[in-house]
Amino acid sequence: MNRTKGDEEEYWNSSKFKAFTFDDEDDELSQLKESKRAVNSLRDFVDDDDEDDLERVSWTGEPVGSISWSIKETAGNSGSSHEREQLKNRNSFSTYAQLPKPASTYSLSSFFRGRTRPGSFQSLSDALSDTPAKSYAPELGRPKGEYRDYSNDWSPSDTVRRLRKGKDKIQLLEEAVSMHDGNVITAVLIFLKRTLSKEILFRELEVRQVALRHLIHFLKEIGDQKLLLDLFRFLDRTEELALSHYREHLNIQDPEKRKEFLKTCIGLPFSAEDSAHIQDHYTLLERQIIIEANDRHLELAGQTEVFRKHPRKASILNMPLVTTLFYSCFYHYTEAEGTFSSPVNLKKTFKIPDKQYVLTALAARAKLRAWHDVDALFTTKNWLGYTKKRAPIGFHRVVEILHKNSAPVQVLQEYVNLVEDVDTKLNLATKFKCHDVVIDTCRDLKDRQQLLAYRSKVDKGSAEEEKIDALLNSSQIRWKN
């Protein structure tokens, strides 16, 4: 059928189908570019100074940057498949209010910035750029409790509340031990002590020796003797159990009750050495009770000279053995060996070494300025009846103690002369101004120069200076220098 040119144009213009031309794609591209230029031209209408004064809103009317806008922007692309199925099953003729609002592809902020919202189609400028766009959406739908572990937001009470199971508590203890920090281990043990039964705690610590030692030390420090005894009883540590039981005497103030308690400790399973100490402790307290009662009576009566001149400053009860010996040497030195308060009786009963006895007796008698007793303390007789002075502690220490108690020079010179080492003797004599000892020693050494140097240290015109001059002018001494 022949058609005119006008009929063909009318046909193609009236038909729903359009003929293909190569210019169509260029027309669409030109339209897209034109739209972009129109969008970008909006920036010219907004001054940079006024941009902060404008309130940016989304297509839904929500202010851009608000909390509700952020939630809707984030939740727009995270709708679940379950919600989509519900939307399909709903009546298509339902009202618009019942349908969820579709996520907006653009917002005013994205238009002004020239880019699309993350998750939507890219603009031409974004498509041509080499850098891919990234979006980070917070998980706003998750409750805070689910990501507390990641944000390190657990409070101490929440942490403790989580550790309700015994295995979690034991794991906590093992982690503390692995850190090798005593403070952390002790803190965990305090928590376990409060939250676990004794049987479970003891059983778990029995195989964890490091934690066990920390608990034992902690219980000793706080004085929890009851729990400590239960622990030793569970571990079958009989000797440590006995020692812990013995420590309870420190809490008993009454002397008679403490003595009776110590008596019950004698039969406990101690080592041989510890058993001897427990027996001595009981015997000493028994002696102290007797001595205290007798001396209190003598002091109140006022008939004993030593108690009148030197009143007691404290009770002898519960004092150490050395203090008790000093007390006896001070107030009861001359008593017979058969009495409980006699120093010799104490020495034999408790097997006090000679050095300790001499030191204590010397300090006590020197304090009383009883120089005759001091002299008798160091005087011994041999089997021929000859006397000799002997000091198990060394005479140099005797001189130091005597000088500390303000002994006169005559007494000091006697014991300085008994020092065997010449250099030590000269040093002590010079230090304590025992002039005769220095002069005689220099004469025996035939040391003229040292004697001449010492002459400047004595008082002019004194008897010591005259003695030195007489020795220096003597022709009978052959000086070595």
Curated annotation (Swiss-Prot):
Sequence ranges of Basic and acidic residues compositional bias: 141-151
GO molecular function: protein-containing complex binding
Compartment(s) of residence: Cytoplasm; Cytoplasmic vesicle; Early endosome; Recycling endosome
Modified residues (Phosphothreonine): 21, 116, 131
Similarity-based family: Belongs to the VIPAS39 family.
Subunit details: Interacts with VPS33B. Associates with the homotypic fusion and vacuole protein sorting (HOPS) complex; impaired by VPS33B. Interacts with RAB11A.
Protein name: Spermatogenesis-defective protein 39 homolog
Gene of this entry: VIPAS39
